[in-house]
């Protein structure tokens, strides 16, 4: 059995949900198209053997077309099955076979897959995520990744490594190095993420707000029972470095809410950890 480095932190980040079931037919995926539904600053579409062009709302995005975002830029793509993908700053993304093969080459994305859709799979280097009927966030770079679930459940795994797979539930986050064995997920504060993430504050409602709010309320109830405890452990912006901060600074983060972030992009300006009460000493 592989040992896992278990942390009982709760960080305000969101992840995508996975539902178990057989894959839909190839024909079902091939009918799915994507369209640009929101553009913030510098976003380019790069087709196969074609020059880059500036993306505009209502542009059609075909499979194999790379979507690139610049510094402090974001974009939203909506597929014909109502699946929504939002990319943060400095991201590179493309897809094939509809939502069956979403490829995040670099950067961060939010993915919302409605229960009526066939589901989706995100590939990012040496890791992958299977999602059905949920809302998730994945940040990927060559040296680290960070995955959060906002509602539902998703599966994070490493293709080609039998058994290296974990279920990540709403309010949980997993992070690590892409080529290392997966670690057990930790808790994060959904409510704080929803208040501070540009994936949420810079866009129109996703359609899964009631589901995310329900999961946040569950966390609040667990806090009132002391099963979850707020900590002063914070991840600022992108990355996976956990910082120990003064409690007053955590309060200031809440007050800033969706204010300008020191690190442009779609991850929250800061994520605050929660501790599982039953594990607290």
Residue ranges and their predicted role:
Residues 92-96, 133-137, 178:
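Extended lipid/amphipathic-ligand handling interfaces
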Residues 67-129, 147-156:
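Short, small-residue-rich packing micro-motifs
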Residues 47-64, 68-73, 89, 133:
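N-terminal post-signal-peptidase region of extra-cytosolic proteins
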Residues 44-48, 78, 155-159:
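A generic structural motif
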């Amino acid at each position: 059995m592989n040992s896992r480095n278990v942390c009982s932190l709760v960080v305000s980040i969101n992840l995508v949900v996975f539902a178990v079931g057989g894959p839909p037919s190839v024909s079902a995926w091939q009918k799915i198209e994507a369209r640009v539904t929101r553009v913030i600053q510098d976003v380019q579409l790069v087709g196969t053997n074609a020059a880059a062009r500036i993306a505009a709302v209502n542009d059609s995005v075909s499979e194999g077309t790379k979507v690139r975002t610049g510094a402090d830029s974001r974009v939203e793509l909506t597929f014909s099955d109502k699946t929504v993908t939002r990319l943060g700053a400095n991201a590179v993304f493309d897809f094939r076979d509809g939502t069956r093969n979403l490829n995040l080459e670099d950067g961060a994305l939010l993915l919302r897959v409605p229960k009526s859709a066939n589901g989706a799979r995100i590939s990012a280097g040496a890791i992958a995520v299977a999602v059905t009927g949920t809302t998730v966030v994945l940040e990927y770079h060559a040296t680290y990744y960070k995955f959060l679930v906002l509602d539902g459940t998703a599966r994070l795994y490493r293709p080609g490594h039998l058994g290296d797979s974990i279920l990540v539930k709403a309010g949980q986050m997993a992070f690590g190095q892409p080529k290392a064995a997966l670690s057990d997920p930790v808790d994060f504060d959904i409510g704080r993420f929803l208040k501070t993430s540009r994936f949420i504050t810079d866009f129109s409602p996703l359609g899964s707000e009631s589901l995310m709010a329900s999961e946040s309320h569950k966390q609040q109830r667990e806090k009132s029972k002391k099963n979850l405890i707020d900590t002063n452990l914070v991840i600022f912006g992108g990355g996976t470095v956990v910082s120990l901060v003064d409690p007053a600074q955590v309060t200031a983060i809440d007050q800033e809410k969706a204010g300008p972030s020191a690190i442009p992009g779609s991850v929250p300006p800061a994520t605050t950890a929660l501790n599982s009460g039953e594990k607290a000493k």
